[in-house]
Amino acid sequence: VHTNIHSLRERHIELWDQFKSGWIGISIDAYREENDYIRYGSRWDLLEKNLLLTKKLGSHWSQWITSSVMVFNSCTMHRLINWFNEFVRNNNLKDLKWRMDPVTNPNLMRIEHVPMHLREEAIEKLKPLVGTLQDKMSNEMISILMKTLRSVEKPTEGSFEELIEYTRVLDIKRKQNVLKVFPHLKEVFDA
């Protein structure tokens, strides 16, 4: 099962736990208002509440949070990882892991649109988190994230302009402002 868990109910957990095994991947891309921006319609309070339901799944279930790392959240993943670390420990969610996947398609969301000096600052904020998570896989993911942030691949031509236009249209339709949520990206969106 892969879900954003907004419609997750206890009855789902009770049913799923009857299976011999299974997996649940939960999409959380950023911390609080950043996640609500990226996953429009998301509500952080409901996400946290429903995440606690996974505690009722037996250890025969693999559980993880998956973060899609992109332009918007590439510099603030430390916020999400800090929250994750605290949340799983405070709520005894010992079976919940964290993983990430870089967004490479569509090209307009690639992290390479964020200037390297901003990504290097993000790496510095991630370094103290290596080794602090409760499982080996999650800790390895932080190292992979830092390596990913150093990418010098070139996005396809025109994809930066697509990013700017896409974000402008989203902000108009949603009555939002990308820079209110991600002020550190001023250099990207005010270019």
Features from the language model and the residues they span:
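Core AdoMet radical
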Residues: V1-E10, W16-K49, W61-V71, L93-R110
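A structural motif corresponding to the C-terminal end of an alpha-helix
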Residues: F19, N50-Q63, F87, L129-M137
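Enzymes that process phosphate groups on RNA ends and nucleotide/triphosphate substrates
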Residues: D29, L47-L51, M116-A122
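Short secondary-structure boundary/capping segments
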Residues: Y40-R43, R79-F84, P115
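Flexible glycine/acidic-rich beta-alpha junction loops that bind and position SAM and/or redox cofactors
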Residues: V69-C75, N92-L126, N139-E140, I144-K147
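Catalytic cores of alpha/beta
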Residues: V71-V88
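Radical SAM enzyme core and accessory elements
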Residues: I123, K127-A191
